[in-house]
Amino acid sequence: MTDYNKLFNLHLEIFDNLTLQTIIAHDKENYYVIKDISKIEYTNYLKVKNDKLPFLKPLKIVKHENHTYFLYNYYENHQSIYEAYDGILKTISLLHKKTAKKVPQPKMAEIKYKKIALIANDRFNMLEMKIRNIELNPVKNDLSWIYLSKYHIILDIKLEIYKMIKRLKMIKDDVEVGINHGFPSQVHFFNNSFISYKYLKEGVIENDLYKVFLDFDSLEINHLEIIDKYLDEKYSKKYFKLMVLFSYLLMCDIEPNYTCASKYIKLTNKISRFMYQFKNYK
């Protein structure tokens, strides 16, 4: 067992284990987070350690027996969920703006849009076949009515996905890419307070924002109010809407059991809320 007192020259007691690599410890005056950092995380940390970005910087770094340990101040419940959500998007936006560079035009992504259209078409055909089987079955039950009553929502996103693909393929502007934090999950953020550099990578900001949104989409908040300020009118909003709806489509299934039906209800409710909140993303 690692002797953290000896490593950091502190008199610490273990308070809680957040993960296998992350613990909370305290002395008489302060609480700390101690994290065992992987080689990838440490390498990525070195790339950004001097940047003026809202990462929580370690108080001390100690290497011991092929391990690298970071010591941080511990802040308990310093942000609400709403503020944390906005903080993630703000950080991603800053990272992109700081490291942005020009890349080929969106028209070069036509192959990707064709692939999305093909996958979406196959998925819609599969769902359509299952719905037709339910409709043709003379015996209806509770599950049948659940799927039939909500299927118009799936038809709505079918039209929207094809419409977004068509409009995106017509846009010829450049798109910015840059270094970002990948797609930090809600659990990752609250448990690690943005002290993980493992997922530092390149990407386009719209891609990161839709993944962050999907992790927070069950929250009963105004997502548009938070996300809108990070997306431009011409390209980003259309791409964001397409990828959220495409992700929802891939999550959708119709099976004769209550577990699947329950997921179907939750998913179609999320889709309805998203379509209403982001109805101006055209």
Give the ranges of each region predicted by the language model.
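ATP-binding glycine-rich phosphate-binding loop
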Residues: 2-27
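An alpha-helical support segment within catalytic cores of ATP-dependent transferases
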Residues: 129-181, 281-282
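A glycine-centered beta->alpha junction motif in the catalytic cores
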Residues: 67-82, 100, 128-136, 248-264
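Active-site acidic catalytic loop and adjacent metal/ATP-binding pocket
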Residues: 22-26, 162-209
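A conserved alpha-helical element in kinase catalytic cores
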Residues: 30-68, 79-94
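Regulatory N- and C-terminal appendages and interdomain linkers associated
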Residues: 1-9, 148-163, 264-282
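Conserved kinase catalytic-core helix
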Residues: 78-123
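Active-site activation/catalytic loop segments of kinase-like enzymes and analogous catalytic loops
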Residues: 206-235, 245-273
